[in-house]
């Protein structure tokens, strides 16, 4: 009983009181930045995670059919409500039109300029995502924005010519809607991907589709993301469904984003583990060899306390052993205070 309990009427005040309750040992906070900051300031040990704004770079060397299939599947999974789902397609110019055609063949709708403006006005409210669109079908997003697409539509695509406050669809939007950015080569793709991450997804997740190992390595090494999903669906890959990552919906973003860990946070992070350690092998011989290596590099003798040849504190015994002070007499007691 009581393995899982919930607040009946969650409010900011009740959540804060729960975090500070004397029986709470550790907090796992998954939500907006305000909730995470509240957890960190509660005075209790806390794991917090950050928001995502996931760029998906498609290189000229990519298998376009497989890349399109991965993106559509990822966007269809829970209607792109996971914070690790793709938010922007960053397309290498030589393959941009062909990739969009592959997406259209899988039910994607490329918005016209007029439709894009309607999406910008409807989905972005003062720099924040319109909460009414979270997790709804693409055709419903279009309908509420003021235009029509078939109910079979899998994802909406809308061009953006930059990243930032002046580009309303470059924020995190948790429904099957992707901004589209066309770039000139993988170096330019790196630049735009970094902009996306710094604009709201620092340390979280990104994906890359390429067969060129040099391109993959550049993204693996240069991007400020804790999870980089290669040649697969970002949403399902980052949470460990289609990859070997630890299964989790709470994805740490690391110190760069103010989080204590970049791990996929699991039950293991919530378990207090005690470790018992015994010596392995001849530790004294390992110590001697380590000191010898250090001495060969520095010219110094054996350190004081090593009790090895050359230790300045090592001396022969002289005179009788010192007497130890007598232990104080103990008066036995029994429960209740009786002395006997």
Name these PLM-found stretches:
Residues 15-16, 68, 190:
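Short hydrophobic/charged patches on amphipathic alpha-helices used for structural packing
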Residues 4, 27-28, 52, 92, ...:
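Buried hydrophobic positions in well-ordered alpha/beta secondary-structure cores of metabolic enzymes
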Residues 1-8:
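PLP-dependent aminotransferase-like
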Residues 1, 17-24, 197-203:
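Short, surface-exposed connector motifs at secondary-structure boundaries
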Residues 36-164:
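ALDH superfamily catalytic-core signature
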Residues 8-14, 31-35, 212-213, 237:
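Short acidic loop-to-helix transition motifs that present clustered carboxylates
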Residues 147-340:
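Conserved C-terminal structural/oligomerization subdomain of aldehyde/semialdehyde dehydrogenase
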Residues 22-23, 42-43, 223-224:
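Short, structured coil segments at secondary-structure junctions
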